[in-house]
């Protein structure tokens, strides 16, 4: 486990060069600039690297998992990161892959493997590659993916990266493999935001999807809650109590600059970005009780959406922007409702249980994740929106704040394990869970960021 992650900034992070590796043999091709984990601090505060990284622990067995062998990359023992191990951890965490023993083999992307051997080892797919340190200190990473069953070369890529981007390159490899073998986009190079509390100090963090490379965007002695990504991943909205009341800010991830969005009379809370990035839904008490409003992402006068004497809060948009799901106690207890994004008569969504909160809608529009109180325990549930079928998918008792991965295949949430708060990811059926166990304080309020442009 790395103790300190390298700080990346627009000034010190060189371009990450990627090349497509076509079918055997290798040929050269053009390069492009890959995404950088550029997280600057609020105002004049310096960017703070994580003091303790996460430890990924995967548990459970999926009903259908693709057996894949990842041969240790040639030369990786001399590198600061074990590329094949990172790729394998990513794929296993997705719940759709299981690792096959790849020991005793020495292969790289230029090798033509004996696929009969790998069939005997029950592998359906094979990843081989190499990593070489260049004279300028950067690393050249190359890999190739093989379909063992069909005997096909599925191509590969190469990356030339600085040391600080070795994990990013590994996540890109996992994305490539995942998409080639499942037909769905991989989420391993996306980011998550979350809040930690250590003593009397609160911090807002941005990290890779596996919890590594965490960088602090904000630290405060006052609570920070409700971080939420914009649809293009360039901004985070959040609520800060530094003014001795809840106020909504918008933070530019690349520059570290922030601006005040909502500081009206009373409480300003629960921001949610519209998918087009032009507006946000917020909960305000400026006119009395807590009601839902929309406000331009540039600020200005909010527009009221709900007109009730109850508490309406926790808005979240559907992926197409047409619908807002939210929590209201208008029926006597907190339940999840939905309405048009411009307002209108709400429709109740949840009926199982007397206390349902924290809605999150999947990007494909098929699923609703939320927290339901069951016999005094707070448990993560998933509803299929087309049928209304609901399933509890955790065995913990203090789950909070679910958020879907951008490919709708995983959920990140906060919970309590061993008396401490921690982040977990789970497949939608609850069969594969990964604990992201931090050591820097209680962890809460996760939000999974969108796909990034490559």
Where is each model-derived feature located?
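Amphipathic beta-strand/beta-sheet edge segments enriched in Tyr/Trp
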Residues: 111-176
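Residue-level detector of Asp-centered blade-edge/turn motifs that repeat once per structural unit
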Residues: 187-188, 231-232, 275-276, 319-320, ...
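Short beta-strand->alpha-helix linker/helix-N-cap micro-motif
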Residues: 57-117, 127, 132
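Short loop/turn segments that connect beta-strands within beta-propeller blades
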Residues: 149, 208-212, 252-256, 296-300, ...
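Hydrophobic beta-strand positions that form the internal "hydrophobic ladder"
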Residues: 192, 236, 277-281, 321-324, ...
